[in-house]
Amino acid sequence: MARYTGPRTRIARKFGEAIFGADKVLSKKNYPPGQHGNSRKRKTSEYGIQLREKQKAKYTYGVLEKQFRNLFEKASRSKGITGEVLLQLLEGRLDNVVYRLGIAPTRAAARQLVSHRHITVDGSVVNIPSYSVKPGQVIGVREKSKSMEVIADALSGFNHSQYPWIEWDQSSMSGKLLHLPERADIPENIKEQLIVELYSK
């Protein structure tokens, strides 16, 4: 399955929430897309509800099925609550950390910055969006990329204090992952236990 590159509002409407960030169209059309989207009311099965939650998590973090399955298996082997560990692993992806640091306006934009070699980890360029950032590592903007408009616009007025597990130094345009976030600190509206139940079938 290839990564979805179509209209993001259509996917957000499918889930009834702005999983990609603020969406003006979604606020006006908060119902499923399609000709009968505003009138369709079908009872969803338990499996359907669980599958929907997994799809929402995949779209939110921009992760493909195989990657998502691998992360779940890693989470299930780890100490701690599997669903919470899964979200921590998703949060620890380099593209997500770049997004949380405010370097990019969306996770998709963050993924592109990483792929195009604009981001460093501990001073070295890393171009793998799925790279797992470890606590204590420093994520920075490559020197020649610091003047990029997309980065400057994203950082302008960004509130870094909203994420207590990271810190940001504007002078060096770099940030540090202090620790993996607690579940209560992750703002995404994902019911991770439903995903655990789906994979446990």
From Swiss-Prot:
**Which Pfam families does this chain map to?**
Ribosomal_S4, S4
UniProt record, GO biological process? ribosomal small subunit biogenesis; translation
A GO cellular component annotated for this chain's UniProt record is:
small ribosomal subunit
Q: Which GO terms label this protein's molecular function in UniProt?
A: rRNA binding; structural constituent of ribosome
Which residue intervals define the domain S4 RNA-binding in the entry? Answer: 92-152
Q: What keywords tag this UniProt record?
A: Ribonucleoprotein, Ribosomal protein, RNA-binding, rRNA-binding
Q: Which residues cross the membrane?
A: none
Q: Residue ranges of region Disordered?
A: 27-47
| Entry similarity comment | Belongs to the universal ribosomal protein uS4 family.
Quaternary data: Part of the 30S ribosomal subunit. Contacts protein S5. The interaction surface between S4 and S5 is involved in control of translational fidelity.
The cross-references to HAMAP family, in alphabetical order and at most eight, read: Ribosomal_uS4_B
Listed NCBIfam families: PRK05327.1 (NF003717), rpsD_bact (TIGR01017)
Its job: One of the primary rRNA binding proteins, it binds directly to 16S rRNA where it nucleates assembly of the body of the 30S subunit.
The identity of this protein, by name, is Small ribosomal subunit protein uS4
Q: Which organism is it from?
A: Parabacteroides distasonis (strain ATCC 8503 / DSM 20701 / CIP 104284 / JCM 5825 / NCTC 11152)
**Name of the encoding gene:** rpsD
